[in-house]
């Protein structure tokens, strides 16, 4: 019973904070004077993508910032190649991002890092949020190299990187 009360109180605080931020930013939104602009980068996985979207939306609310959700669709993730269940999860995650006030950007590219960096420059992104990279023994070297490359490219643009658990 105590857990339910705590959850209810937390939900009420979250809703109250969102309403307060919405009222505060109503005037700001007309002039597009956001100081921070967050970008959540997702893949076609259900739970990890949903978690990244929710945490980025929460961060954007705390920071009084706008956020976008980027899905970079590679050739191996073409709609005719991924299972219908994953397609459904992806659409549900896009809808979730829109419901939470984010903009969904879907780009077809096999160059994920360059796409992320280009969008950061184009949209003046201040913070990129990703889920933790998946390391396996087989792909440890390649994944580490790509991660370092992303980190270095974002550092040159003075863009922060947040790795969400």
Where are these regions (language model features)?
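Gly/Ser-rich helix-loop-strand patches that form or flank binding pockets
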Residues: 1-17, 21, 128-165
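Charged helix-capping and loop-helix junction motifs
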Residues: 55, 85-89, 142-148
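Structural beta-alpha unit
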Residues: 5-31, 100-128
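Structural motif
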Residues: 41-45, 109, 131-134, 165
């Amino acid at each position: 019973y105590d857990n339910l009360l705590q959850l209810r109180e937390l939900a009420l605080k979250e809703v109250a904070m969102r309403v307060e931020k919405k009222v505060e930013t109503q005037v700001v939104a007309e002039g597009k004077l956001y100081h921070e602009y967050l970008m959540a980068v997702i893949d076609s996985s259900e739970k990890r993508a949903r978690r990244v979207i929710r945490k980025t939306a929460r961060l954007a609310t705390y920071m009084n910032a706008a956020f976008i959700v980027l899905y970079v669709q590679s050739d191996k993730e073409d709609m005719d190649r991924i299972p219908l269940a994953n397609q459904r999860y992806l659409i549900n995650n896009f809808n979730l991002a829109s419901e939470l006030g984010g903009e969904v950007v879907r780009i077809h590219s096999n160059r994920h890092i360059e796409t992320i960096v280009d969008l950061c420059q184009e949209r003046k992104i201040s913070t990129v949020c990703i889920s933790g990279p998946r390391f396996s023994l087989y792909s440890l070297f390649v994944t580490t190299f790509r991660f370092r490359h992303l980190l270095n490219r974002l550092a040159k643009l003075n863009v922060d990187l947040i790795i969400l658990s």
